[in-house]
């Protein structure tokens, strides 16, 4: 946010002013959810620029990871920021364009599906539960 603010001084900064969208926030009090909310609702040009650039970088790095790991079963994105910008990611081609933009490997990149995991699913707890279940089975069989 601060970087984009310094690089784009002409962009209106709504988040740091009292508006109909809320009270002004000091830089130290700004959270990612504030930036995402104002960006998704097109209420703050700077926040929109931040989310746009983040989404592009996210797509680039996700694509780089795909080339390293070759995830033919798909890539599963999860987390608070991902769930916050999922509508933006689905409606704007920046993520997928950055993901697939790998020179002569563009067509190859289309082999990998990208999924956004619903943030309401407790993935960590489900994983811990599965691990505990496997350990119980292993120990009950005398291994």
Residue ranges with predicted function:
Residues 1-143:
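ATP-binding/phosphotransfer module of carbohydrate and carboxylate kinases, centering on a glycine-rich
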């Amino acid at each position: 946010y601060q970087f984009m603010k310094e690089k784009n001084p002409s962009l209106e900064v709504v988040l740091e002013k009292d508006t109909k969208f809320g009270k002004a926030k000091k830089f130290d009090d700004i959270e990612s959810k504030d930036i995402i909310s104002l960006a998704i609702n097109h209420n703050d040009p700077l926040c929109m620029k931040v989310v746009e650039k983040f989404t592009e970088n996210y797509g680039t790095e996700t694509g780089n990871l795909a080339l390293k790991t070759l995830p033919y079963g798909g890539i599963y994105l999860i987390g608070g920021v991902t769930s916050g910008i999922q509508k933006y990611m689905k409606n704007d081609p920046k993520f997928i364009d950055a993901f697939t933009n790998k020179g002569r490997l563009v067509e190859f990149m289309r082999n990998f599906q990208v999924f956004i995991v619903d943030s309401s699913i407790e993935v960590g707890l489900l994983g811990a539960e599965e691990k505990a279940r496997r350990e119980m089975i292993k120990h009950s069989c005398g291994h």
